[in-house]
Amino acid sequence: MTISDHPETEPKWWKEATIYQIYPASFKDSNNDGWGDLKGITSKLQYIKDLGVDAIWVCPFYDSPQQDMGYDISNYEKVWPTYGTNEDCFELIDKTHKLGMKFITDLVINHCSTEHEWFKESRSSKTNPKRDWFFWRPPKGYDAEGKPIPPNNWKSFFGGSAWTFDETTNEFYLRLFASRQVDLNWENEDCRRAIFESAVGFWLDHGVDGFRIDTAGLYSKRPGLPDSPIFDKTSKLQHPNWGSHNGPRIHEYHQELHRFMKNRVKDGREIMTVGEVAHGSDNALYTSAARYEVSEVFSFTHVELGTSPFFRYNIVPFTLKQWKEAIASNFLFINGTDSWATTYIENHDQARSITRFADDSPKYRKISGKLLTLLECSLTGTLYVYQGQEIGQINFKEWPIEKYEDVDVKNNYEIIKKSFGKNSKEMKDFFKGIALLSRDHSRTPMPWTKDKPNAGFTGPDVKPWFFLNESFEQGINVEQESRDDDSVLNFWKRALQARKKYKELMIYGYDFQFIDLDSDQIFSFTKEYEDKTLFAALNFSGEEIEFSLPREGASLSFILGNYDDTDVSSRVLKPWEGRIYLVK
């Protein structure tokens, strides 16, 4: 195949961009109230620019009661006062642009907060004009104790039933996530129009360049909201994906949203969208340029490997081969199409990648963190880097339940305690699971300095909203890593420079082929672009190992590696060593 057979290589700013994700609560506190804020982000824009990224994606900063850290929005057009003002946000957008970067915001429109005015109206009576903007259903019946039975057997993503009973009108409302995070009914055209105008149009008018679309595969539910088939025989409640994911009108809705954005923007700027679709085989449909839906998607296959499909905190063993195939599934579908892909291994919903997929021991933390950097920077698709990932942040160690903040952890802890007891095997397994997999590992405050107690995130006399990961005392902080040429931070800068220099192969490379796929130590592959070939050899083990050449007699020209004192002509890789070559 030639370049003409690969429409996915058509250049776009959002394909070539490296996008830095910011979790505002934990990034930088500018006013010493213990919470990160928008002015804090603005104060660190030069740091972000110097890293070598091209855009920032800021997680929800909208007004919210914060049941789920801002993903429960009560007003799409207003900044949560703890984060600042609308003017602070407009200033952040403007200064981001002045530094030559794009600004992407989170679009959370599958659900809103029960504190949103739309829901307050809807719940007020069964005849309210906005009643049908949400999913209201009467009880299926009543149990022996007289308690109302939910309308179907769907389980919330956060545990328990996906339905909450509201005594105002004695009906249940659907909420696939937290109890006060109520699902919007996209079947209602007036509801869709209001969502587009308030959540999308308002921010397009103020200059945003794109949206990360939260839970983008959930807007079209299965008609009638029927009971799910029994997939998990250990539970009466069933995972909601069957009834809520990739429903019959999902692509129609995304095309409508795309048209709204295109018609709203009058200055010619190209808006990018990345849809969090999680699972399924529709990725090529979502991202086909000819279908006008979303620019690219986040798939969860590679980051959910090692977890149970029925309960995210049940640890399941997996092999390197399985992980290699899962990672490749993120971009193989675009080969020879007009679709596009993403590459990421961390975000605000995932634990730290070094702990999960490499080696966070003091001996190998840095070198294995750099190995993951090499892997990510060499993969096809738009690259995302999550705050703290660039300094090699790792999971915190052995925290008691009282230190966790995540509503998902708290809900499941209470469910397990009630069902099995505090000292049960199930509870012990749960603690092992959250130690490896909890979202809280990615949400601890950003360590800017080595200074105790708050590492420069907030003032030394301030109590931060969340505990810091103690790793800042072991050198995992921006201040010390900036001065250390051998740090993970400075390696990220070099790797991003290489990704730009070799963008044809690293970003747009096609015809991906595994080398030694069955190896449970070596992750190696080739990619092509016109007459050029990239070869990556990555050792995902603590032992020395020899790699295979991409073809017999191949001549290799070294691009980048994570060991400074290595013989790049040798085919033996040191523990957790990775190298990227051009094949001649």
Swiss-Prot record:
Signal peptide residues on this chain, from the entry's feature table: none
Enzyme Commission identifier(s): 3.2.1.20
Molecular function terms, GO-annotated: alpha-1,4-glucosidase activity; alpha-amylase activity; glucan 1,4-alpha-maltotriohydrolase activity; oligo-1,6-glucosidase activity; sucrose alpha-glucosidase activity
GO cellular component: plasma membrane
Any one biological process term the GO annotation gives: maltose catabolic process
Keyword hit for Repressor: no
Catalysed reactions listed for this entry: Hydrolysis of terminal, non-reducing (1->4)-linked alpha-D-glucose residues with release of alpha-D-glucose
Keyword tags: Glycosidase, Hydrolase, Maltose metabolism
Alphabetized InterPro entries for the sequence: Glyco_hydro_13_cat_dom (IPR006047), Glyco_hydro_b (IPR013780), Glycoside_hydrolase_SF (IPR017853), O16G_dom_2 (IPR045857)
Pfam families: Alpha-amylase
UniProt-annotated site: Transition state stabilizer, residues: D349
Active site location: D214, E276
Family classification: Belongs to the glycosyl hydrolase 13 family.
Other information: Present with 4030 molecules/cell in log phase SD medium.
Name recorded for this polypeptide: Alpha-glucosidase MAL32
Natural source organism: Saccharomyces cerevisiae (strain ATCC 204508 / S288c)
